Amino acid sequence: MTTSAVCAGDRLLATGGVSQIEGAAGGGLVPWAVITGDGTRDQIGVTAFYTVIEINDFRLKSSGVAVGVYDRLEISLARQLFTLEKTAPGQSIRQDIYGAKLKLAGDAVVDQDSWMPQISIGLQHKKNRDMRIPADLGARHDTGTDYYVSATKLYLAGFAGRNLLLNATLRATKANQMGLLGFGGDQRDHYQAVLETSAAVFLADYFVVGAEYRIKPDNLSVFREDNSADLFAAWFVNKRVSVTLAYARLGQLADKKQQDGVYLSLQLSH
């Protein structure tokens, strides 16, 4: 391996996405098929991120690192801290997420003469480290693994002369609120397939706006779990720094309804 192959970055700006809340490359809520970092097929890319979501009655912080190997394999690690604020003052829930993603076929950017998107498979193994409250709500397990397949395609000049990115992710999961409230419940304790989608428009090479929608299972009888959505804007300052600002609508969380607020994320790449 040559020196230039390590932590190099020759990929087009913004085509690696940002850091998803669970650590994978993608949008804010949804993993995409792209591999993290700016590395190409003979390079290794590294990203680090810090994200805060401030909603009506809760605060979620997520931080982590990810490595993209030869634009083929992605390994990620994230730690989440969910502060319960008004629901249980002084209480918080920690969760660790270990992720892996493998590109199977296609290239979201290069294959413009083909209909085929980039396709990747991935997993996110989650460990909830504070299960007292989730167990009280009916959660069955403190550990779970999500499995997903993502398809991502960039259409050059695909929308009003601007580049358009579309993504669809199918996830198999038992997680309650992405695992923050444990896994499985008294209503359901089996894997369910849920759809997650993203659409983004490149207003400039360095500025992207878009929306995401994430369907989630409803395993606990005590409170309903709503689906999540966001509207985001991502500014890629350069190949090393990006900032994402979003309006996140997370629906009901535990006993608090209509939880929405601001999502802010900083990503550093090398």
Predicted regions: what is each one?
Residues 179-184, 196-199:
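Solenoidal tandem-repeat scaffolds enriched in leucines and small polar residues
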Residues 2-3:
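N-terminal signal peptide c-region/cleavage motif recognized by signal peptidases
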Residues 7-160, 164, 171-174, 183, ...:
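Transmembrane beta-barrel domains of Gram-negative outer membranes and organellar outer membranes
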Residues 187:
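Conserved short-loop catalytic and cofactor-binding motifs
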